[in-house]
Amino acid sequence: MVIFLSFIKRYINEFVEAGSDIITFHPEADDNPEEIIKMISDAEIKAGIAIHPDVNIANIDHLFSKVQQIIVMTVTPGFGGQKFMHEQVQKIKDLDEIRKNNNYNYEIAVDGGVNNENAKICKDNGADVLAVGSYLLSQNQNNYYEIINSLR
């Protein structure tokens, strides 16, 4: 679950009670993202952050050791079907390097415009998880196994 809400703190308990196993949020949505990460972690749920395309990772790198997932947004959040922003691949690569150099355990996910033309680029640069909703649903076939395998 990725959340882009103001006042996220007031909803965390509800998401935990609903059975979430990971809660990922945009750190710029709150003045104290460390507190949100602690609230999520204290509930024994995995915590993650989603990085908006306009956010410089150097401004939030103090959060990386505290989370289990980082989502690189490769479109501007808001609606599906947007084009993949290739300039965000550098963030994927940088996050992978930071993870390796610091022995961090977060997974890197990519969300936004991922398809068969850019999935390999994302994986080759360190992505562990690819969100492919729009691509998957835009294919004119019902064999999701083949579609998903085309992304491997």
Question: What does each model-identified segment do?
Answer:
Residues D31, E35, N103, N115, ...:
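Expand to "…catalyze enediolate/carbanion chemistry for C-C bond making/breaking, isomerization
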Residues E107-A109, L130-G133:
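Conserved active-site loop/cleft motifs that coordinate metal ions or position small ligands
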Residues R10-Y11, S20-E107:
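Conserved anion-binding
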Residues I40, K123, Y135-R152:
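C-terminal helical cap(s) of enzyme catalytic domains, especially alpha/beta-barrels
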Residues K9-E17, V55-V67, G112-L130:
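Catalytic cores of alpha/beta
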Residues V2-S6, E28, H52-D54, V75, ...:
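Active-site beta-loop-alpha junctions enriched in small/polar residues
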Residues K93, K120, N149:
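Active-site phosphate/pyrophosphate- and oxyanion-stabilizing loops and adjacent acidic/basic residues
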